[in-house]
Amino acid sequence: MSDIQQNYSSKPKNGPAMFRALVLPRKGFNTAVGLPVIKATWKGAQADKKALNDYLVTLNLGKSPDLPILYPHVMAGSMHMNMLSHKTFPIRLLGSVHLKNRITQYQAIPVNAVMDLHSEIASYRLVEKGLEFDFTTVATINGEKVWDEVSVYFQAGRFGGKTNPSEEKSFELDSLKDPEKTGSWKVPNNRGKKYAKITGDYNPIHMSSLAAKLFGFKRDIAHGFGVLAEAIEYSSAIEQAGGVEKALQVDVVFKGPVYLNSDVYLRQNTQQNANRFDVYCGENPKPSICGEVVAV
């Protein structure tokens, strides 16, 4: 099968993509076939001022002349949705879990920057409990790379990984041992709907308690990237790693849900040019999110 290329000159629409994700039948992953090569490019991407302001207000983030380090991922979200909902993609979107991210920002990105965003569904790995597949995104300004990421998704299933796993492994972050508790905050009950309106991520598990229960959760859950943004803010992770003047890398592993209307707290260890933190939800003794910000 030849590569699939999607090109955009403005922000892709999410509605049709969500419809395809919900309605179109999927063949399911087949190791003999693999994944199709799907690429997308959004030229002239620029942060919408109202959406950016709503993002900052909703997540209690401070204003800055530069974009938050996670924001290019938010901007590319609708492009990702259109790629994952393409008719040739064999995996049902609602059955996939956003598992990990590695983001590298090579320089601060001004809020009014005009970027080109390029994404590609890249490699996959067979693991014991299913399949991991990678999504790469690169942001350039005048041809210079300023930001990139690898998003790792997980699909549960029997694909042979238990007996014949892939040699390549994705990165991991283990829970901190005896970390200092450094902060806490409340994830409000309306966060799912507010964040979805800003980002276009209307996954039912964030919108409805009933829908979330159908997927095995006790109630609706917060968007992981929203909670991660708050954790980076509360932990002062970027400042501890040297500030936006330096090239920075953010690693995150989403290990469990953060429920809406819950109290969350932060534990962290800080070293020179590095900040390692875990986010806990309510009384759960295990962290829901493990993250790290380091200078590179």
Regions from the PLM with identified roles:
Residues 235-269:
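A conserved acidic, glycine/proline-rich C-terminal tail/linker
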